[in-house]
């Protein structure tokens, strides 16, 4: 039998074996049989030793062509097997579009987030800027720039988280006010609110947390009066607790304001008659406020004889607790889905 006839028969048999391979494993066995180191095509090269030298190049070329032909057929068959496997898998996994779809759980905004955004929206509408600041703050801005000297009780190590002697976790968002005023170089107006997290060395219980949120507001301009502060706070109370709410101002003391006041809102549950929410007083304390102390203005670079201002600070945690009847501040931070789902239901009713 001639070498040419041997290659022709080998090619035909290889094509038959390739077409009969029904899976990738069988196809791999065919490849090894013909193209492996000890395969049939490799065996043809052994015949070259018996050929005249002038015939060896042509014979070697034909062997390589045969190898390439078989490889091409193997590749084509491989692609066909992969396609058949995929089609079979798709046929077995046909989706019945008439079946009911899967319910996708949709979340809702956290009650604290809702409260903060509601307050922000109100003040944005009044022309305020929202300014954020550092949670790790310098003692200088957290206390000294706010008229709190080194000897003030609020600077006690038991009340604040100090990192170094001059660096601490901010105890309020007031440093944002101090930095903002300083950056204006004594030129008004300043009209900002400062939301953010603050830190106190409190023991966690139903009404206290070592970390909570705070929103403070500041207005500095010429001829700012106490009546401007009162009007702003009345608008805030009506927005948060209802249009029929009233406020009252009680004298208080804060180092950075003079005069200072505590702000109460008429009880939204008993309408001022007295209940467990307002402790039978008819009023609920919601925030502290006052006229910016002249020392604070001067330290920030403002001429206190020309400029005046008011400031206020509130805890969205407390506002949300009052508004939604939440009795424990820790619920805000435990990420209990059962608790949060209640606010999704309220949202669906359009009550929030």
Curated annotation (Swiss-Prot):
InterPro entries the record matches: aa-tRNA-synth_II, aa-tRNA-synth_II/BPL/LPL, Phe-tRNA-synth_IIc_asu, Phe-tRNA_ligase_II_N, Phe_tRNA_ligase_alpha1_bac, Phenylalanyl-tRNA_Synthase, tRNA-bd_arm
CDD domains for this protein: PheRS_alpha_core
Assembly and oligomerization: Tetramer of two alpha and two beta subunits.
Places the protein is found: Cytoplasm
Cofactor(s) of this protein: Mg(2+)
Cofactor note: Binds 2 magnesium ions per tetramer.
EC class of the enzyme, as a word: ligase
Classification via HAMAP family: Phe_tRNA_synth_alpha1 (MF_00281)
PROSITE patterns (UniProt xref): AA_TRNA_LIGASE_II
Keywords: Aminoacyl-tRNA synthetase, ATP-binding, Cytoplasm, Ligase, Magnesium, Metal-binding, Nucleotide-binding, Protein biosynthesis
Record-listed Mg(2+) binding positions: 258
Keyword Signal set for record: no
Pfam families tied to this protein: Phe_tRNA-synt_N (PF02912), tRNA-synt_2d (PF01409)
CC annotations in GO: cytoplasm
GO molecular function: ATP binding; catalytic activity, acting on a protein; magnesium ion binding; phenylalanine-tRNA ligase activity; transferase activity; tRNA binding
One BP term from GO: phenylalanyl-tRNA aminoacylation
Family membership: Belongs to the class-II aminoacyl-tRNA synthetase family. Phe-tRNA synthetase alpha subunit type 1 subfamily.
E.C. code: 6.1.1.20
Catalytic activity: tRNA(Phe) + L-phenylalanine + ATP = L-phenylalanyl-tRNA(Phe) + AMP + diphosphate + H(+)
Protein name in UniProt: Phenylalanine--tRNA ligase alpha subunit
Main subcellular location: cytoplasm
Source organism: Staphylococcus aureus (strain JH9)
Domain of life: Bacteria
